[in-house]
Every structure is written in structure tokens, then in C-alpha cells.
């Protein structure tokens, strides 16, 4: 399973972002998926 835009993700142990998104932790302490365009 994957999570979409603005959904919480984890770099190390999931959940991971869907294709087209990557996990960023710049919104610390929460990591979220953002579009990789």
C-alpha cells in the first residue's frame, strides 16, 4: 500500500509514497508525501 499527496509517510519503515511522490520531512515532526515534479 502507498499514500498520496500530503499524507503522512516514513522514510525508514513505511508507509511509503505512491509513484510520483516522495517523502519529505521538512514539515517536522511529520513527514509527508509531496509531488516530485
Curated annotation (Swiss-Prot):
Function of this protein? Insecticidal neurotoxin that induces an irreversible spastic paralysis when injected into insects. Modifies presynaptic voltage-gated sodium channels (Nav), causing them to open at the normal resting potential of the nerve. This leads to spontaneous release of neurotransmitter and repetitive action potentials in motor neurons.
**One Pfam family this chain carries?**
Toxin_7
State where the protein is found: Secreted
Q: Is NAD one of the keywords? A: no
What are the cysteine partners in each disulfide bond? Answer: 2-18, 9-23, 17-33, 25-31
Q: Which UniProt keywords apply?
A: Amidation, Disulfide bond, Ion channel impairing toxin, Knottin, Neurotoxin, Presynaptic neurotoxin, Secreted, Toxin, Voltage-gated sodium channel impairing toxin
Give the similarity note. Answer: Belongs to the neurotoxin 07 (Beta/delta-agtx) family. 03 (aga-4) subfamily. Aga sub-subfamily.
Q: Which InterPro entries match?
A: Beta/delta-agatoxin_fam
Q: Name one GO cellular component term.
A: extracellular region
**What protein does this entry describe?**
Mu-agatoxin-Aa1f
Q: Which SUPFAM superfamilies match?
A: omega toxin-like
In this chain, where does the modification Asparagine amide occur?
A: 37
Q: Name one GO molecular function term.
A: sodium channel regulator activity
Q: Which residues form the signal peptide?
A: none
Primary localization class, coarse: secreted
Where, by tissue, is this protein expressed? Expressed by the venom gland.
Per the entry's comment, what about the domains?
The presence of a 'disulfide through disulfide knot' structurally defines this protein as a knottin.
Amino acid at each position: 500500500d502507498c499514500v498520496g499527496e500530503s499524507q503522512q509517510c516514513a522514510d525508514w519503515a513505511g508507509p511509503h509514497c505512491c509513484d510520483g511522490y516522495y517523502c519529505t520531512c521538512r514539515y517536522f515532526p511529520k513527514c509527508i508525501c509531496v509531488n516530485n515534479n
